[in-house]
Each structure stands twice: as structure tokens, then as C-alpha cells.
Amino acid sequence: RRIPKMLEMKQLLLDSIAEHPELPQEERGNLLGECDLIQSFLMYNDISRMSQFHRSASEKMTRPAISIRSDGGWTFGSPSVLMMFHRKSGDLDKELEEMNQCMPHYYKITNGHGQGAETIMSAEAHFMRGNFVDAHIALEKAYTQIQGNGQESIALCCDFLAQRLSICMDIKMRNTFEERRKELLQGHNTTWVNIFDSTCAYYYAVTGQTERIPALFGAHMLSTVNFLAPG
């Protein structure tokens, strides 16, 4: 549903450039960079193609983008960056390298939107490969990287990995499930709460605590919510 709006915004920017030839070259570059950034999201979830547009936008722009809110969600409702961008068996190392290379360009033009994504994806890759100690080290690095930067969607990805790691090794999570949910409720953002509840549902299902699965999932009420709805 959002693709037509994104294309409309891109066309408005291109029309503005065409209608105002007097624009300074620097501002023309900024507007063209915005167009590249918008186009990159239409390539989701192909990190190779998205990266091409991020690099192009980074080369053209001298200011942060105005088409992206740096405090908005980065993961499209997913609690896992790995689940978002791992597309093909055997390509994980390539995908991790592409994330490492492209994200600094993206951060530059979005004021750090999604900061820590490549770090938590690396941590998840270690986890999926059974390298639990390396996963824990990378997880703590991700937590440190996002501390105080407002990237709640990445923090939720960290929480989800911490939950899964706690099943496989003896680690201390930063908050109890109840404490973390209370913290999220204080932010008055139902998207974050729903994402967190989805990770709790997974954890309780895997550990056999089915009576603790949040009602949204345990009672099969997903059709009643929109995970991407603001607030």
C-alpha cells in the first residue's frame, strides 16, 4: 500500500528539480539523493540492490535525508535483522559483508537510523551457526552500540536474540520480560509492544510455557492488529 506513496514522493522531488533549474548544485544533489534513498526501499529485501542506492545517495547528499525519520522503526515489524535480509542458502557471509559495507552510507544520510543493524545481524548469524559465545559477544556489542540512540526496533532485535541465547547458554538478560514490557508500555507505541510480545510468544512456545504466551498469539488474534500501525 505504501509503494505508490513512495513513488509519488520520488516524482515530486524529480518534478521540483526539473521546475527549478536555478537550484544550487548542492541542493540538486540532496534531492536526487533523497530519490535514491526512496528507491532503495523499493528493493527490499535485496541488500545488494538496496546498497547500490544507499551508496549513490551518500555520494550525492551533503545533509541528512528529510524523507526518513531517524527515530522511526527500521525493521518493518520484524524482531530479527537476519530474518529480514538472509535470502539464499550459502550466501550468508556475502550478505553480512554487504551489510557491513552499506550501513555506514545509510547511517550518514539518515542520522543513524537503524544503527546497530549490521552488528545484531552478525550476532544472529553466530547464533544460528551454534557459535553461542561469539553470538553473546556480538550481542553485547550491539547493545552498547545502540545505547541511548533511540533505535528501539534494533533494541528489540537484541532482546529477541538474548531470549534465544538464554535457552542455549547461561546468560543474564538485561531485564525480565515483565520489566521490559513495562518499559515499552511507557513509550506508548503499540508497534514496539506487539513486536516484543511476538518474541515472548516464540520463547514461551519453545520452552513449553504455553500458558504464558501473550493472548494476541495464544488466542490467534493477529488479524485484529496492524504491526506497522504508528503509535
Describe the role of every protein-language-model region.
Residues L7-D15, G29, A123, F127-G231:
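Helix-coil-helix junctions within alpha-helical repeat/solenoid scaffolds
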